[in-house]
């Protein structure tokens, strides 16, 4: 009996449940936790056209940053061009004044032939500046120089220049003529030396009236002498 029991005990010990072996844990790491960090790299695909456009824009920005404008040089160039245009305009007006002088000289030889003007006669000049008509009285040299200056500096328009018997009388006659034709739409300044038109469209009509009056009066003065 004892041998049988001994065998049974031995066989039961062989089929006993297996116990897991506990691993030794260090004293300082009883409550420590182990974390596993997983990094994920996401690669985005950028279209090629976008990259090219971006490079072009960056290149333009860089070029603009490196561009420095010399405004003084630009201003100097514009001043030179403006000065050149002013010189051309001055030469043009001088040529016009010279041609007018030659034309009037030729007219004097044909119209006033064998007629000697009295010594007290002075030259009477008329010029248009925008919406204003100016009159000038003096010797021939002074009047022609003043007309040339106005035409050159103020882009004025030559209207009339001729020797007259009484320039002050002509001024008063022109003031009466323009006032009768245009009324309050024309303003008389400086003892009838200057006539300003309120309506710029009427200055052409006023200029024609002045020329006609002065030409008619010139012929009558010549006939009187």
From Swiss-Prot:
Coiled coil region boundaries: none
Modification(s) after translation: Palmitoylated.
Domain of life of the source: Viruses
Subcellular location: Host nucleus inner membrane; Virion; Host cytoplasm; Host nucleus
Major subcellular location class: host cell
Keyword Transcription in record: no
Keywords: Early protein, Host cytoplasm, Host membrane, Host nucleus, Lipoprotein, Membrane, Palmitate, Virion
Entry GO CC: host cell cytoplasm; host cell nuclear inner membrane; membrane; virion component
Subunit description: Interacts with proteins IE0 and IE1. Interacts with protein FP25K. Interacts with host importin alpha-16.
Record function comment: Plays a role in the sorting of ODV envelope proteins to the host inner nuclear membrane. May facilitate the fusion and release of nucleocapsids into the cytoplasm. Modulates the expression levels of IE0 and IE1.
Protein name, per record: Protein E26
Native source species: Autographa californica nuclear polyhedrosis virus (AcMNPV)
